[in-house]
Amino acid sequence: MLAKRIIACLDVNNGVVVKGIQFKNHEIVGDIISLSKRYTKEGIDELVFYDITASTNNKLVDRSWIKKVAEIINIPFCVAGGIKSVEDAQNILSFGADKISINSSALIDPDLITKIANRFGVQCTVVGIDSWFDSDKKKYMVQQYTGDANRTYQTDWETIDWVEKVQKKGAGEIVLNMMNQDGLQNGYDLSQLNEIRKKCKVPLIASGGAGCADHFYQAFDHANVDGVLAASVFHKKIVNIKDLKYFLIQKGLEIRIC
């Protein structure tokens, strides 16, 4: 059995780590390098860096800090932000990232998923999906350009259909960003996760809503996700990573010990 993963998310804007609520009103929370060191020392399994404005500003994520991160940590990390081509992915991987994640660019050109997977392998190819519950349609819908609240808009894709599409195109992992829950710290959207899990045959990472240790357990136990991603509870030290891992081990989960 593969160990379940605990992942820290670092949203990056203009070279610093920020955090918002439901992808809005971001505040600075710290420095990229110092937070990377801290989380590695505390025993996190993986880091994910999202340059939240790269796609909306039509630019590639700043590679200078990627190289610095690669030099100071010894755990896998994934980078997302403005990746529009195989060459962009190559640049980021060559600076030391273990995986790349695409989101808005995959919606524009789904074949980009296939091209990246064929070139670097599915293990390097992550697709992020920003999902929002549309109360009028009573459906979960995919959002695009979520790094800028003024440019965010709802696509025609239902989340469940897009999950199936990206798998067919070669996604090796899916990060489901549940926007309705993001930053609220009242738990992951287990209902949505369960529905997505039925259709998702690749590793599924839950993102959005963690507020306490039990929320992580619920995502693993009730929805059988492969990893849980969180930001606020780690940035603010609401949840201690080592304590979280021992809590999950006591619950019977396979977790990498710090």
UniProtKB/Swiss-Prot annotation:
InterPro entries: Aldolase_TIM (IPR013785), His_biosynth (IPR006062), HisF (IPR004651), IGPS_HisA/HisF (IPR050064), RibuloseP-bd_barrel (IPR011060). It is an enzyme of class 4 (lyase). It comes from the Bacteria. The active site is at D11, D130. GO terms for molecular function: imidazoleglycerol-phosphate synthase activity; lyase activity. It catalyses: 5-[(5-phospho-1-deoxy-D-ribulos-1-ylimino)methylamino]-1-(5-phospho-beta-D-ribosyl)imidazole-4-carboxamide + L-glutamine = D-erythro-1-(imidazol-4-yl)glycerol 3-phosphate + 5-amino-1-(5-phospho-beta-D-ribosyl)imidazole-4-carboxamide + L-glutamate + H(+). One of its GO terms (biological process) is L-histidine biosynthetic process. SUPFAM superfamilies: Ribulose-phoshate binding barrel (SSF51366). Keywords: Amino-acid biosynthesis, Cytoplasm, Histidine biosynthesis, Lyase. Its EC number is 4.3.2.10. Pathway: Amino-acid biosynthesis; L-histidine biosynthesis; L-histidine from 5-phospho-alpha-D-ribose 1-diphosphate: step 5/9. It is found in: Cytoplasm. GO terms for cellular component: cytoplasm. Transmembrane segments: none annotated. IGPS catalyzes the conversion of PRFAR and glutamine to IGP, AICAR and glutamate. The HisF subunit catalyzes the cyclization activity that produces IGP and AICAR from PRFAR using the ammonia provided by the HisH subunit. Heterodimer of HisH and HisF. Belongs to the HisA/HisF family. This is Imidazole glycerol phosphate synthase subunit HisF. It comes from Buchnera aphidicola subsp. Schizaphis graminum (strain Sg).
